From Swiss-Prot:
It is linked to Defects in Foxe3 are the cause of the dysgenetic lens (dyl) phenotype. In mouse mutant dyl the lens vesicle fails to separate from the ectoderm, causing a fusion between the lens and the cornea. Lack of a proliferating anterior lens epithelium leads to absence of secondary lens fibers and a dysplastic, cataractous lens. GO terms for biological process: camera-type eye development; cell development; ciliary body morphogenesis; cornea development in camera-type eye; epithelial cell proliferation; eye development; iris morphogenesis; lens development in camera-type eye. Induction: Head ectoderm expression is induced by RAX and lens expression is induced by PAX6. SMART domains: FH. Transcription factor that controls lens epithelial cell growth through regulation of proliferation, apoptosis and cell cycle. During lens development, controls the ratio of the lens fiber cells to the cells of the anterior lens epithelium by regulating the rate of proliferation and differentiation. Controls lens vesicle closure and subsequent separation of the lens vesicle from ectoderm. Is required for morphogenesis and differentiation of the anterior segment of the eye. Controls the expression of DNAJB1 in a pathway that is crucial for the development of the anterior segment of the eye. This is Forkhead box protein E3. Disruption phenotype: Knockout mice are viable and fertile but show eye abnormalities; in some cases the eyes never open. Eyes are much smaller, the anterior chamber is not formed, and the pupil is markedly smaller. There are no abnormalities in brain development. Mice show reduced smooth muscle cell (SMC) density and impaired SMC differentiation that is limited to the ascending aorta. One of its GO terms (cellular component) is transcription regulator complex. The keyword Protease does not apply. It comes from Mus musculus (Mouse). Residues 166-189 have a biased composition (Pro residues).
Amino acid sequence: MDAQVAFSGFPALPSLTPSGPQLPTLAGAEPGREPEEVVGGGDAEPTAVPGPGKRRRRPLQRGKPPYSYIALIAMALAHAPGRRLTLAAIYRFITERFAFYRDSPRKWQNSIRHNLTLNDCFVKVPREPGNPGKGNYWTLDPAAADMFDNGSFLRRRKRFKRAELPAPPPPPPPFPYAPFPPPPAPASAPPARLFRLDSLLGLQPEPPGPVAPEPPCCAAPDAAFPPCAAAASPPLYSPASERLGLPAPLPAQPLLALAGSAGALGPLGAGEAYLRQPGFAPGLERYL
């Protein structure tokens, strides 16, 4: 029997071409269209496409120096002739030394400026009046010279902080040794009045001495109250005398005249003679 007639009931097998095995058809490819060629060979990994709601990762920056901004500034100041540079000179040193900052955007310049103003290890030096130019100088604090380990700008020991100056002491109190204010000065004693009752009572007769010549109206020794004295001197007002019912005190001149003429008044003194005058009210002795 013919073999072609015996397998006529089975579907025909696909014919194999001598060119080699055919590539499998990719899912979603149109029939009759050849698949696109893969670029880079089979060793290349396909790029991960972020799904919806996911952020694409930023690529790593290649060629960036391993130094911090503080280390870059300190490196620029260390290579300066006078150990000080302006901000523009620091930018120029960094771009000339590292090509990464020369080709990258200028955002790093803001970081350099912020590190200069926020770190205590950098000190601003004003420009001299006779030195032309723009901008102030920046230098490294002498106390921060050992900020990096063994002069390596890759490792920093600790954050430098400038020591603050002590505050001035408060002023001393006005009386440091006296817990209480000093006592007020004693008030001066009021001046003694010319005539007081107690001074008249304690009046003692003075020893006889040279007596000035008396006026003619007071020459009579037997007159206790000369009329000329009463007429010459007006009576003085005394509230105490009025309250006690006493006559007004005599002026100074008649009293001195009475004290001088002790013989006319009797054996008693001038004070006793003054108390025994007939003008006193009865019962005055109990007030003395």
